[in-house]
């Protein structure tokens, strides 16, 4: 069996736990705005902030020097500390509730995930199945066989991974369909429902608006009630 060369991930070395814990506590507060918990009550719902941070840290390689297993990777201790602090700053920004849909913050996180994946692909370019397993232009898919409230597949999708979720409970299946299956099908599309009775500037803004993500779908839900 041909070995796979896998550098240590950031989650195996260190995490900015104080920032993650604070963001998770804030997320549980009432009145913070729209949240997946509003779709349907689900016990043991995982905080979105924790899910986002953990998936990022699982996908990003730790910068520290590593050797053994037929490969060398990373930088010396001093440089690794500086690089780790940079990655921590991304996580600290990523877990903030107000940055949940902040494209600038999400883009930085996605870029780091892709960079680590390409480093891993480069280490494994001699693998007999490299063309199948290590495509540097296609991130590995995310699978959650017991997705429950859907926090993990939702955040994996937000970080640029192709998400797949399943569950034995039909309520969980419905929640995940509503969060990760249906919205991407209508991403970037304008609403199709009856337009509200608007006049003047408000009407012009409604029809000239660029609908990003699932905004058009959300507007349809509001229009139809």
Model-flagged regions — what are they?
Residues 1-225:
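S-adenosyl-L-methionine-dependent nucleic acid methyltransferase catalytic domains
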């Amino acid at each position: 069996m041909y070995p796979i060369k896998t550098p240590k991930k950031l989650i195996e070395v260190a995490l900015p736990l104080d920032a993650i814990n604070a963001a998770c506590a804030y997320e549980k507060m009432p009145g913070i705005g729209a949240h997946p918990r509003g779709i349907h009550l689900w016990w043991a719902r995982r905080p979105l902030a924790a899910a986002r941070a953990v998936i990022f840290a699982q996908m990003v390689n730790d910068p520290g020097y590593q050797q053994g297993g037929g490969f060398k990777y990373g930088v010396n201790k001093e440089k690794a500390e500086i690089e780790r602090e940079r990655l921590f700053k991304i996580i600290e920004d990523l877990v903030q509730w107000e940055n949940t849909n902040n494209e600038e913050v999400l883009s930085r996180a996605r870029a780091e995930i892709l960079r680590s994946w390409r480093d891993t692909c480069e280490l494994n370019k001699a693998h007999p199945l490299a063309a199948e397993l290590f495509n540097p232009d296609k991130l590995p898919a995310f699978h959650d066989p017991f997705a429950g409230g859907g926090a993990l597949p939702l955040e994996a999708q937000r970080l640029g991974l192709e998400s797949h979720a399943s569950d034995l409970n039909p309520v969980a299946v419905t929640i995940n369909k509503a969060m990760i299956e249906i919205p991407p099908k209508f991403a970037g599309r304008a609403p199709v429902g009856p337009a509200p009775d608007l006049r003047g500037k408000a009407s012009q803004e409604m029809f000239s608006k660029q609908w990003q993500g699932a905004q058009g779908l959300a507007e349809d839900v509001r229009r139809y009630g």
